[in-house]
């Protein structure tokens, strides 16, 4: 018998995470690696757990993630967004808790492009008065 799975897609900066929630004992696997090996920073692991803590479902679901693009912070944010969206499929009554914690909002902040004549997005070349 096929077991039920819940899907959610999360995005942050240039990262995209495809998240699957499967009823289980709380294992988190990212790109076929244990999440503690994949994300070396404890603070970012807390970010990933936020939706599960907000809905008091930590330890009820195994989280299986495919994520690509960006760095550690962007990927952690994308996973958080995907987990929150997948939890809505589990039970729509989680929406108020997730929304009040701000976990359903796609963070729109992106890297600003470099402009010609400047060294970066806003950094100008050194100015010499004389």
Swiss-Prot record:
Q: In which domain of life is the source organism classified?
A: Bacteria
A GO CC annotation recorded here is: cytosolic small ribosomal subunit
Q: Which InterPro entries match?
A: Ribosomal_Su5_D2-typ_SF (IPR020568), Ribosomal_uS9 (IPR000754), Ribosomal_uS9_bac/plastid (IPR023035), Ribosomal_uS9_CS (IPR020574), Ribsml_uS5_D2-typ_fold_subgr (IPR014721)
* Coiled coil segments of this chain: none
Q: Where do the segments described as Disordered lie?
A: 109-130
GO biological process: what's one of them? translation
Q: Name one GO molecular function term.
A: structural constituent of ribosome
Q: Which UniProt keywords apply?
A: Ribonucleoprotein, Ribosomal protein
Residue ranges with Basic residues bias: 111-130
Q: Which family does it belong to?
A: Belongs to the universal ribosomal protein uS9 family.
Cross-referenced NCBIfam families, in alphabetical order?
A: PRK00132.1
Spell out the HAMAP family in the cross-references: Ribosomal_uS9_B (MF_00532_B)
Q: Which PANTHER family match?
A: RIBOSOMAL PROTEIN S9, SMALL RIBOSOMAL SUBUNIT PROTEIN US9M
Annotated protein name in UniProt: Small ribosomal subunit protein uS9
Q: Which organism is it from?
A: Listeria monocytogenes serotype 4a (strain HCC23)
